[in-house]
Amino acid sequence: MKICEKCFNNTEIVEIIANDNSKFDNCDIDNDHLGVKIFDTTKDIDKLELIRDYLRPALELYDISINLPDTFSLKEGKKIEIALKDDWSIFNVEEAQISCILNELFKDDENLDRRVLEDLVGAKIINDKKYTNK
């Protein structure tokens, strides 16, 4: 899958994608992203790993709702793509496209609990009293 620099707001990820040896092509994520610098998830394995390594810490801030403390309300649970869009400025595309990107990037990653990409999640740190005023 071809993912482009315009799919991201994060400058570090944009730099990974847009480095000197990047190819120009059309993005598979957003049909409006034409003639842009892309990386192919099936060919550019080094870039894939760099982007995974950059995104993984943000994903690890979240846990599936059944693993969160009793103080966590299930009503607070969100899909990861919504949580990331609400809490961070990593992506420059809509939730469905974020989901597609995450599923493509992490489809064979054994270091990530796939349930984070599929189930409702909550941020672990939000419910930890030592980090909040709650």
Set out the residue ranges of the language-model regions.
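Intrinsically disordered, low-complexity terminal and linker regions
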Residues: 1-134
